Amino acid sequence: TRGQPGNAVVVFMHDRPRRYLRERFRYAPDVPKPCLIPRMFTERELMAAFRQEQHQKLRREAGKLDQIALLSRCVRELAEPDTELCMQLAKTDDAGFFPWGVRLADLLEECFTQGLTPEDMLYTEGEVAPFGAALLGSLGKIFRRYRDALIESDLTTPGFDAFVVASALEEGTAGDDLPPLPDFLAGRAILLAGFGMLTGTENTLFRYLWRHGAQVFLHVDPALAENGQGHWACTEQSNWIADWKADTVLACPSPGKKPK
C-alpha cells in the first residue's frame, strides 16, 4: 500500500481477525496517527457487497422460518396429483412438514454455498423415510422453484447471495475477458487472509479477485512455499495452490519447528 493502509481491502473468514487488526492499528507504536485503516470484510459481507453491486434492489434476508414457509409453498406447488410427493403431503400438515423443511432448507443452502444445482435423486426408497424419499425424488425441481421464489419474493440468504455472485462471475469469465472490479475494490490492494478450505462459491470469487492481483495469505506449513511438499494436514491448501497454478512466496521466516 506504499505506507497508505487505507488503500487496502482485507477479507477475513469471520469477524475476530478484523477486531484484532483494528486493535493492532490502534495501539501499534510504529503506526503513525491519525491514519486510515484498511477496509475490512468478512467473506459473507463481501458476497453481499458483490450481490448489491450486481443487483441494486435491496432484498430482505430470509430467516429459517421464512425459508421453511417458502419451501412448503414451493413443494405443494410442485406436488402433481397421483405422484408420491402429493400422496406424502396429503398425509401431513404444516407442523408435520416443519422438520423436513428444516432439513431441506439446510440442504439447499449448502447447495447454494457450494455453487451446485442438484438434480432429482431417484430410487432412495428404503434408504430414507418415505417423505424424505419423495422430497429427494423432486430435489432438482424443488431447488429451481425455491430459487425462483426467493427472487420473486425479494428475499435472499447468505448462500443464495453467494450462488448469484458466483454464477454471474462464472458467466462473465467464460471467455478470455476478465470483468472489471466493482467500484468499491477498484484501485485498492486486496488481501485474502485466514482461509483454509474454500466453498465452491468462495473459490469462484477469490480466484476472480486473485486474477485481478489480490494476494492470498495462508497460515500453513512453510514447506508449501519452499518445495511444494507440505505436511499432510495442508493437503487442501496444497490442492488449492495447484488448482490455481499459483506461485508461492514465504511471507515470514519459518519458526524452524517441524510439524508432527
Feature map (PLM): residue ranges:
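Nucleic acid-machinery interaction/catalytic patches
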Residues: 1-260
